[in-house]
Amino acid sequence: MIRLCIFDLDQTLVDTEDMKELREAGKNRTDAAYAGEVLAAFRSRARHLIDEMTLRMLLLTIPGLKLGVFTRSPRRYVDVVLAEAYASINWDIVIAYEDVQRYKPDGEGVHRSMIAVGMNDTDQLPYVLLVGDGDVDIKAAYNAGCRVALFKKGWPHSYQKTHWRSLSLLPDVVVGDQKEVQTCLQDPLPGLPYLERLLEAGMPATVKPRFDEIAKFFPGEKARHVVHAAGRYFTSCEALKYRREWHHLSQSIQNNKDAVIFPSEWIETIRSFIAFHYLILTSVLPFSGTGPELVITVIPARPDRPHRLAHLLAQLQASYGTNPRLNRLRLTFNPNVLGYRPGVQSQSHDHLKQEARFANVRDHLYVANPSEVQGKRFLVIDDVTTTGSTLLYAKKYLTDAGASSVDCFSLAQTVSDPLKYQ
């Protein structure tokens, strides 16, 4: 259960998109005239995205819950808006523009909020939730090391780039209304990506499993390619150290970087994705033969390295028994569909940037037996994806060889330094 819930203000607690210029003009202003302008503008229409009654119910139903606000808006503006919108709420901490030296996406405001309510240790970070509407909130939470809920109630019906960018950061939970916020505060685990929930809670999702669709692009192209991911991998950069410390999946991936026997949770996650993603194929009766076929393969190892994902694939195959199938869907496992030519570099160890990663894969990845690909359906699996270059070229080369369809799946999507690109 969450002990400290920190809300973003604008487009999270209240809808103030039309007050942007007035808000930005208020930095370091304390005069009554400015406060009057803010109050008049705020009263001009309905503003609540999360109403006062909801916050009062949170305090009544969650014993000991502390409430805070962390915003980049100026203090005078914040005080006026909160006094008008939430007159009966005694906020435990309010962090405004003037209160921090480093603004979002830095997590300084989260740490200040924790100290203000007596949560002084980093081992209490799993009990802190930041609720916000945009990518800057997610990055601030990642940098601070706490959980984050992406709040979409104030979003437009047609998403813009900023909204897709927020979703691509894979927040802990995505919520659409204030009722879902209450549910998340009581138990933040059900909304996690599938593999993360399995590792942290010890149980799979009881409703729709969460496998995120992450948009990937070839450099210079606008065509969107989907990679399905079951969780996140937080890198070892300094800006993510607090989140990485208690993130089960990041630890699991690190612990198994040289493994040949993999955690049962990894196998269960892949099985659940296959059952969920290919639900229609598993239930449709074939017109003839023994049912549709799905060829499951993995990203190859470099020529000088052990093919560890081949062991993952063998373990997955063994989990289905002697006749691998899912209802009517026949499952075929082949670790050698793809290969790398000599000279391929390590994407991570050689610290390749995005364009170099794509060029490296483009020039070295190949389909081992193109004649065996024609007309078949493929699922390509990787353990961790960053730019998506490996999975995207696997899909491209299999499609070029005549595959009828290719889906890409990764156990985890890399989360990189949240302070690097601002």
Q: Residue locations for each model-derived region?
A:
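A short, structured active-site edge motif that brings together acidic residues
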Residues: 89-105, 297-301, 327-344
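Short, acidic loop-to-helix structural element flanking the phosphoryl-transfer center
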Residues: 33, 39-69, 75-79, 107, ...
